[in-house]
Amino acid sequence: MYNVLVFGMTENPGGVESFLMNYYRRIDLSRFHFDFLCNSYDPVAFEDEIHAMGGRTVHFTSRRQNPIRFRKELESFFARHAHEYQAIWVNVNSLANIDYLKMAKKYGIPKRIIHSHNAQNMDSRLRGMLHEANRDAVGRYATDFWACSEYAAKWFYAGKGGRGEL
């Protein structure tokens, strides 16, 4: 069994969440197991379906709500459970927070996928600046660079020569 830790689910059943569930519904569950990291204690979109399919949802304090508690909870989870996973698949709209990739590398998850789902900053100016700062840094933590479009690859991976797999 290949165990994958997935980040990208929120309470909103939007584009990224629907993409992940479409993928999860079609994956061979006899070969792959998905667990989902959720940066909120509220139920995420499709949570009941995830559980019914055998997946687990792991909830954390939001970094925005309490950055110190977020970091402590994240560190604790990875210290206890990273050895259970062969991959982490981080699905995001910006690189403002790459803590999941950093922890995955620190605790030895061998395959670390970053997947871009956006082609421009749709958030605050601060998150835009964090995205820019992390564009070059992400190459130290991720092993694989995916994107939903050429534009998304260029916006995320400009520091990597626009490298991204569609």
Feature annotation, model-predicted:
Residues 2, 6-14, 22-69, 163-165:
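N-terminal strand-loop element at the rim of the active site
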Residues 8-9, 62, 91-93, 116-119, ...:
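Histidine-centered beta-alpha loop that forms part of the nucleotide-sugar donor binding/catalytic region
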Residues 63-66, 95, 107-128, 143-144:
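A short, histidine- and acid-enriched strand-loop-helix "catalytic/donor-clamping" loop
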Residues 88-110:
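An aromatic- and histidine-rich active-site surface loop
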